[in-house]
Amino acid sequence: MKLKPGKLPPDLLQKLVEGFVIHDSVSIGPGIGFDSAVIDIGKEYLVVTSDPITFVTEDIGYYTVAVNINDIAVTGAEPSFMTLTVLISQEDADSEKVSKIFNDVRNTAREYGISVIGGHTEVTPSIESTITSATMMGFVEKHKLVRQDGAKPGDVVVMMGLAGVEGTSIIARELDLSGSFSTEEIERMKNFYRDPGIIILDKVRCLKKFTTPTSMHDPTEGGIAQAIHELARASNTGFLIEFEKIPVHPLTLKLSKILDFNYLGLISSGSLIATVKESEVSRISCPDLKIIGKVTEKSSGVKLLRQGRVEDLPRFPQDEITKILA
């Protein structure tokens, strides 16, 4: 079977991760929708995640730290340590370019109190553009761990942040949009990765002040829609999402119409999807929290309510950005 760019098909991935030897201390191992492993180390859990940066050619050091922070944060853990791998293309084999990557990693890690403890670097002719990847580790008290398979029917689905922020920023920096947007609009979109930003640690911290979510997910490749499908699969439930309640920036909406893509399937680091018990929703006071749906029985499927009509929530095994930047 010829594979397309993007995430592997879930059924194939499930087969690939089956059969690994799992140590007794592993509480959560590899699985669909599980971005982090959880290891029992006694009084706490050690949470471990790995994520590469493949879509971005600028500021990849910042992105590398950011996306791994997010994977740790959605478990309820605080990020603490990371290792870094930098595979440098021959085109980028320049000391100034490499120094910028490391400076961005250093500054971002320092800002969030993360120690970079090792890694690997090399120049390789095997890739067209530089690829970075990190493994990040964090710690969480056992009773505060948030599992991605914890959603239950009746839970409320909430969202913080905006759909497609990361993808909008990448597109604005990779394509010439001057024929459709003003200079000010283009610069605004380019800066989306900083403002409103793609790191969700503060959003998670706010949510945790008021409740312990039953599940959390940071929508990366495949966007909001794919994140919902992954939560549904992990928790063995259905979801009903209200389209009109999903927050999106007007510039992302305009961009989606001009380039003909669905922003629900656009890479969306910077947003947070969580499920919380219905009885706890009213006490949550976080600045940009929106209620966007509810968790249903598995038999109900994963649905989208749009203009009063219920339809299947689309899947995006390949992020919408892949067809734009192809």
Model-inferred region functions:
Residues 40-48, 53, 78-176, 294:
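Glycine-rich anion-binding loops of enzyme active sites
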Residues 28-31, 219-220, 238-247, 265-267, ...:
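Beta-strand->loop->alpha-helix junctions that form or flank phosphate-binding loops
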Residues 57-83, 100-111, 202-206, 226-230:
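Small-aliphatic-rich amphipathic alpha-helix that forms the alpha element of a beta-alpha
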Residues 169-186, 190:
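Short, compositionally biased
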Residues 1-74, 156:
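N-terminal glycine-rich phosphate/pyrophosphate-binding loops that anchor nucleotide-derived ligands
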Residues 90-93, 192-267:
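Active-site-proximal betaalpha loop/short-helix elements
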Residues 275-281:
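Helix N-cap motif at beta-to-alpha junctions
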Residues 3-13, 286-326:
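Acidic, Ser/Thr/Pro-rich beta/coil linker or hinge segments at domain junctions
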